[in-house]
Amino acid sequence: ITHLIVCTTSVDMPGADYQLTKLLGLRPYVKRYMMYQQGCFAGGTVLRLAKDLAENNKGARVLVVCSEVTAVTFRGPSDTHLDSLVGQALFGDGAAALIVGSDPVPEIEKPIFEMVWTAQTIAPDSEGAIDGHLREAGLTFHLLKDVPGIVSKNINKALVEAFEPLGISDYNSIFWIAHPGGPAILDQVEQKLALKPEKMKATREVLSEYGNMSSACVLFILDEMRKKSAQDGLKTTGEGLEWGVLFGFGPGLTIETVVLRSVTI
């Protein structure tokens, strides 16, 4: 491991990157990147950063870790912030890790997915849509009522930017790994793009089993999809399809897009 990226909502000094380096016995000169308080879009952010590091540092192997303790936002009901109850109902704790590299060593390294293209954007007129604040009361969480509408309104533009160069305009022909911010977001995205219900099956399965684990969610969904694809006897890790998309949505409102290519099983 040459590089380490850690993403978490917790705050310690030295950070979790230091603790992991010691715990795993990594070399003391491993290049560490610590990302705090990024929120739900950061599962895409860590992959984008890892891709850049792997492509621009020959032989790099990047360990990516997302560890989220969203229980720190839990508190009693507030008359002034009823929206906090939404997050408390949806959130869950979770951690996931993967390794990113380029030029895999034949017969030794077996990639599961290939990252082809990445992007990050701020949705127009979305300031204050999702907020988190670290205050005396702890980490507070607030969101506007129309977050699902903002996401669904902007997702088509992100898809066109990502897939037009590949000649893909049928979004039922690709596999989907979308951050499961909540059922309402998934419902509106499905409706906006006329997606078949099975497109979000892996995403909804993770939301149902574990809740919204912030940045860790999309990594859980990647794992869920590749395992289910193998169990069902499909040809690729992406539900038998070649191309797919990974979306992260979070504070900002920030949207992360990753174009994925599956691998033959």
From Swiss-Prot:
One of its GO terms (molecular function) is naringenin-chalcone synthase activity. Pathway: Secondary metabolite biosynthesis; flavonoid biosynthesis. InterPro entries: Chalcone/stilbene_synt_C, Chalcone/stilbene_synt_N, Chalcone/stilbene_synthase_AS, Polyketide_synthase_type-III, Thiolase-like. It catalyses: (E)-4-coumaroyl-CoA + 3 malonyl-CoA + 3 H(+) = 2',4,4',6'-tetrahydroxychalcone + 3 CO2 + 4 CoA. Its EC number is 2.3.1.74. Keywords: Acyltransferase, Flavonoid biosynthesis, Transferase. It holds the Pfam family Chal_sti_synt_C. The active site is at C40. Induction: By infection. GO terms for biological process: flavonoid biosynthetic process; polyketide biosynthetic process. It comes from the Eukaryota. The primary product of this enzyme is 4,2',4',6'-tetrahydroxychalcone (also termed naringenin-chalcone or chalcone) which can under specific conditions spontaneously isomerize into naringenin. Belongs to the thiolase-like superfamily. Chalcone/stilbene synthases family. This is Chalcone synthase. The lineage of its organism: Eukaryota, Viridiplantae, Streptophyta, Embryophyta, Tracheophyta. The gene is CHSII.
